[in-house]
Amino acid sequence: MLSDRKKIILKAVVESYSQKRQPVGSKSLIHLPELQFSSATIRYDMLKLEEEGFLKKNHTSSGRIPSFKGYTYYLTHLLTRDYDAANSFPLIDKVIQNKTFHKNKVIKEAIKLLNSLTSYTAMAIGPDVFNNSKISKIDFIPLNHKQALILIITNKGDVQHQNISLDQTKEISIYDLKDIVKIISDLLVGKYLSEAVKIIQSDFVKQTIAKYIRFQEQLIALFIEAFSSFASENTYFAGISEMTKKKEFSDLELIKKIMNLLERKELLKILLNQEGLSFKLSDELQLTPVKDYMILSIPFAIDANEKGTIAILGPSWMKYPKIIPLLEYLSIHLSKLNQE
């Protein structure tokens, strides 16, 4: 439990770092009106905050910067929302209430607006196809004696295909493989995508397929990739190109890493199934190669079966008091789409 004084100092460090983008020392805080403490007191509490894991030392200076624990505490307990953000709410209302847009168009345009208002990459997944779409058909189409096409069709009419080749094996024919896919089809048709992902990875399916072929892991991976692709097509991004124009994003290698992050399926795992406002600092996640970036996300629910997530990807020094109210407002009003 942090003392009131430590809370004030931690809040000041986070917001000073966000504003100046420089490691924070006690001398830079002593002039703040909310910190009526001596430089020695501030320095002592900053040392204690570092020992407790809320701050970390910057090796290139004597100052300190927030750790993920520090950001988490700040965002959960100390953040004061900047209600000047409400000046942008009518722009969000205009998008949400546009009667000419279907739901996915509303989400796409809202993400573009969120990018415009924050200047950071905005993204959305939704509505949640994994819990809203069922597999209606799986087709196996032989192309020749070594290659085939697997088509997976949902009850929403969405289609994904995967190519499969037997060039690496002589253990079965293409027609034997068709029989195996028929076994898988019988297990998956009629199931929600979320159920299908669990079934295809179950020991029962693995053991069943293993009776016929040795490359069952590769076959299962094809199905999982197809299921993930359904969600990928329902994922929207805005503001990726603008990042390259910012001074702090001028490192080409960094841009490549960010692009890889956005394209990887792991991003879906980060954003989906979160409750309430969630924040992930990239260098705390082994899934992401990028350091010093924060993903802020919040879910929305149009109804019980149409759920999604909106998010902002930006540097850890984002101006959270302005950005978080926009995310929260957009989430609330996307959840009212059926009422508009």
Swiss-Prot record:
Keywords: Repressor, Stress response, Transcription, Transcription regulation. InterPro entries: GAF-like_dom_sf (IPR029016), HrcA (IPR002571), HrcA_C (IPR021153), WH-like_DNA-bd_sf (IPR036388), WH_DNA-bd_sf (IPR036390), WHTH_transcript_rep_HrcA_IDD (IPR023120). One of its GO terms (biological process) is negative regulation of DNA-templated transcription. Pfam families: HrcA. GO terms for molecular function: DNA binding. NCBIfam families: hrcA. This is Heat-inducible transcription repressor HrcA. It comes from Phytoplasma australiense.
